[in-house]
Amino acid sequence: MNSNKSLSAALLGALLMAIAPGFAFAAPKPNILLIVADDVGYGDLGPYGGGEGRGMPTPNLDRLADGGMTFFSFYAQPSCTPGRAAMQTGRIPNRSGMTTVAFQGQGGGLPHAEWTLASVLKKADYKTYFTGKWHLGEADYALPNAQGYDEMEHALLYHLNAYTYGDPKWFPDMDPKLREMFDKVTKGSLSGKAGEKPHQDWKVNGEYVDTPEKGVVGIPFLDKYVEQSGIKFLEEAAKHPDQPFFINVNFMKVHQPNLPAPEFEHKSLSKTKYADSIVELDARVGHLMDKLRELGLDKNTLVFFTTDNGAWQDVYPDAGYTPFRGTKGTDREGGNRVPAIAWMPGKIKAGARNSDIVGGLDLMATFASLAGVDLPKKDREGQPIIFDSYDISPVLFGTGKGPRTTWFYFTENELSPGAVRAGHYKAVFDLRGDDGQATGGLAVDTNVGWKGPEKYVATVPQVFDLWQDPQERYDIFMTNWTEHTWTLVTFNQAIEELMKTYVKYPPRKLQSEVYTGPITLSKYQRFKWVRDELSKEGISLPMPTGN
């Protein structure tokens, strides 16, 4: 009888291991390699109809997709800083205050109270490492080595074009005092271990110079150092097979200005700088994957590749391609739906394709689940916290559908979403960029993001069926027999539930904000009256500045 009970227990254990992905990783915990590119267009890569067909072959990313899962409804945020903040924290950007692009000299950054992928995985005893683009602020408390990463090497704090502002070869007409200011406030490559004061490796400029010994490296060579840092970490990690690791590699390409490394110039079929840079990005991903396999780390490592936001078509032709309406900086699909590939041999089915609603927000809950830790109930300063992240491990391992049914789209400092996806329907309230123009069934000019007009619908949203019309061409809210006015019930309910969370979990102070539109004298005086009245009750409000 005892032997039968033992056998039954063993069989039950085996069954649980087979059906529950979380149990399967109890020992050993999986390693995680997260590769994030910059501004890659949905249609740039081979698995999405790009690659060789667009004059920019991507054999390494093609191979990654062939061996893993490709996502077709994966969402980021519409610009760099919010996209990276959402990915790191598992929270919509307005909760952390990281709502818009961070510029040099602003200081501040990701609040220390926020949890990141790294700080949560540290609770599961992971070794954590960061290299490449951070773009989440300049203050010491906001840097990777203060946000859960054991070490950061060649952390870069800005978008690529920020490194050209003080370069006289780029802008010879700039006032010398302004150039001096940019030189002073623009930080270069930063490195340091947790608990240490970061040190600057070298400054960055927009030239074809690779002279770290002289204290300067140009834009074309940055990703070489990011790749080298990633490979160095993997080689060291292989010496400690019982220590699970999380490495976050963030390539600077293909944000404009695209300046391919010399060995990749004219290596694409189309010979353009953007295409050459895609070829370079693909090659560097391939080098990391080759090293992973060479070291035998591929057997227990989840690799996840994605990008921070949609294609920035405002800067065409130095820009990615998206088949969707809109561009970076808008609530349209073109600004938010991005490429994403997950790979883990023996765990993720080769050649899998998924169209569930998932996104960068979901990496937090997913990685925590794989590591066997719960998401915290309080932030790092002891205050209650909420996450907007869903565990998509059932999707990855083929055991179930994605739990997410909605996606909220935000641009800049929106508190209520500018658009909402519920199931396969999408409501658009913020018409930023294209002014909500009717298309007549034709493609919309998407070369207007931040440069386009800012406008909200008066009363009712535009509604699109993303299954039938992923390009958002046909508004079906009130159109004869196709009208879908009834969808407002679902959209309103989703927004109501979101807005309730702000009451219990108030958003943090904005960490980066640029010009947000004109302030009229009447509005200024009205605000001043309210401010003066509140001051009598001891409540202080800053005066608006237009920023």
Which residues does each PLM region occupy?
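Formylglycine-dependent sulfatase
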Residues: 2, 9-15, 23-457, 461, ...
